[in-house]
C-alpha cells in the first residue's frame, strides 16, 4: 500500500461519514477493559531509537510510542494514560494473544502468515521499511553480491532469516546466517568480528550503528534492500471495534498531515477552518466519533497530543 492509497482510504471514511452516521458503534471488550482500568496497555520495543526508547527518567518516546499515546488520547482523553510494556521479539505476540497488552506497537512487520494464523489483526502501516545489511567500511564490501559465502549475524524469531536465505538462494550467494535469540547477542557478535555483516530492518541498522558502534562512521549500510517491511500496530482478533479504533486513529493522523492539521494548529482550525474535510475530521460539523464508540473530539485530541 502506498501513502497515496493510505490517504485515500482515510478520506473515503471521512467523506462517507454522513451515510453511516445513524449507526453508532458498540464498545467492544477491549475498550471496556481500558475504560475500567483507565489505561491503554501498549507493548513496545525494549529500546529502538526513533521507535521506542525510555530515557533515564522512564519517559518513553518514538514513533511507536506516539501511536500508543494518540490512541490513549482518542479513547481516554489523555495521551499520558498509557502503560508501556517493553517486549522482546520472542515475547511480543504471546503478550498480545494472552491479553497482557491491548495493542502491540513494536516495529512489527505485517505478513500473511501473521495475519492469518496467529489470531491477530494488522491495523495500519505506520512505517515502510526494508531489510538491509550493515558492514565495516574497511571490509571494502559495497554490494550484497560481495557477501557470497560470508557469515551474517541476525536475530531469530523475525522475518529476517527467511528474507536473507531467500535472497541468498535467488542470487546464488551461499550466505551463512549466524542466528542469535537476542538482538544484543547478534549485534555483539557482529561488532566482535564474528560476522562480516549484521542484518535487520534498515531503521534498526541505523539505530544499531549510531547507538552501539564505537565509531559509527566505520560502518555502512549496503544500498540494497532485500525485502519490503511494512510496520504497524497489531491487535487481537475477535474485537472488531478495537481494531477499527486503532486503525482509524492511524489513518486520521495521516489525513491530518495531508490537510495541514498539526499539533500547533489543531485548536485554531477546529473553530476557524472552512474546509469541509477538516471540519469533519475535527468533529466540528459531524460526530464521526460515535461510529467508533468515541466522542466527536477523538481525533482532535490525538493530534493535539502527538501531532500528525
List the model feature ranges, each with a label.
Residues 35-36, 72-77, 97-101, 109, ...:
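Sec-exported extracytoplasmic/periplasmic mature domains
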Residues 1-13:
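Bacterial N-terminal signal peptides that target proteins for export
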Residues 69, 73, 77, 81-146, ...:
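Acidic, polar ligand-binding/catalytic clefts
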Residues 27-30, 35-105, 281, 292-306:
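Extracytoplasmic small-molecule ligand-binding "clamshell" domains
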Amino acid at each position: 500500500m502506498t501513502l497515496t492509497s493510505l490517504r485515500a482510504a482515510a478520506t473515503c471514511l471521512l467523506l462517507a461519514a454522513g451515510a453511516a452516521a445513524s449507526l453508532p458503534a458498540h464498545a467492544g471488550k477491549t475498550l471496556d477493559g481500558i475504560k475500567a482500568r483507565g489505561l491503554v496497555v501498549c507493548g513496545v520495543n525494549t529500546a529502538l531509537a526513533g521507535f521506542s526508547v525510555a530515557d533515564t527518567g522512564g519517559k518513553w518516546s518514538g514513533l511507536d510510542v506516539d501511536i500508543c499515546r494518540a490512541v490513549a488520547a482518542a479513547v481516554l482523553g489523555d495521551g499520558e494514560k498509557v502503560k508501556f510494556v517493553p517486549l522482546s521479539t520472542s515475547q511480543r505476540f504471546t503478550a498480545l494473544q494472552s491479553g497482557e497488552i491491548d495493542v502491540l506497537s513494536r516495529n512489527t512487520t505485517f505478513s500473511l502468515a501473521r495475519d492469518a494464523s496467529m489470531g491477530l489483526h494488522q491495523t495500519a502501516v505506520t512505517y515502510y521499511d526494508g531489510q538491509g545489511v550493515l558492514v565495516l567500511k574497511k571490509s571494502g564490501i559495497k554490494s550484497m553480491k560481495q557477501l557470497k559465502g560470508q557469515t551474517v549475524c541476525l536475530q531469530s524469531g523475525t522475518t529476517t532469516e527467511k528474507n536473507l536465505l531467500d535472497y541468498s538462494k535467488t542470487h546464488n550467494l551461499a550466505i551463512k546466517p549466524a542466528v542469535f535469540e537476542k538482538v544484543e547477542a547478534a549485534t555483539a557478535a557482529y561488532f566482535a568480528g564474528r560476522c562480516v555483516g549484521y542484518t535487520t530492518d534498515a531503521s534498526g541498522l541505523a539505530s544499531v550503528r549510531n547507538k552501539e558502534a564505537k565509531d559509527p562512521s566505520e560502518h555502512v549500510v549496503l544500498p540494497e534492500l532485500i525485502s519490503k517491511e511494512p510496520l504497524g500496530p497489531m491487535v487481537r482478533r475477535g474485537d472488531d471495534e478495537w481494531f477499527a479504533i486503532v486503525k482509524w486513529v492511524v489513518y486520521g493522523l495521516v489525513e491530518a498531515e495531508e490537510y495541514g492539521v498539526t499539533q500547533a494548529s489543531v485548536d485554531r482550525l477546529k473553530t476557524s477552518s472552512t474546509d469541509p474535510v477538516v471540519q469533519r475530521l475535527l468533529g466540528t460539523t459531524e460526530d464521526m466519533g460515535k461510529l467508533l464508540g468515541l466522542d466527536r473530539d477523538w481525533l482532535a485530541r490525538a493530534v493535539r497530543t502527538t501531532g500528525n
